[in-house]
């Protein structure tokens, strides 16, 4: 795993919500994330290590309150972990590069994959394809 910043360094770099989500497996409140309604063309990166995670053309409105994607940029971009917390059986997704918590993946997405990668905005940064502007969740 590439991210080896200390907890103190990450606390200085990230907002309280970003730290909570990425380092403590937290979840931001639904419909509050800065990147939920972003419709620009570009790439969504890990907020912690900047590794590319999702292309904008795989993003869709699932109605769940968090940015949703049907496919990551590569198999290596995401790490999958069985999650049995909160009395549920889910699959947690983490950054394949730095192990930051991103959200969960569910088998109820659209074709071509049938998967819904439900991702906290607070774990993402977005790079605009046209002008290079960056937005952080």
Curated annotation (Swiss-Prot):
Catalytic class of the enzyme: oxidoreductase
Cofactor: Zn(2+)
Domain of life: Bacteria
UniProt-listed SUPFAM superfamilies: Mss4-like (SSF51316)
Designated name of the protein: Peptide methionine sulfoxide reductase MsrB
Protein family: Belongs to the MsrB Met sulfoxide reductase family.
GO biological process, one term: protein repair
Cofactor note: Binds 1 zinc ion per subunit. The zinc ion is important for the structural integrity of the protein.
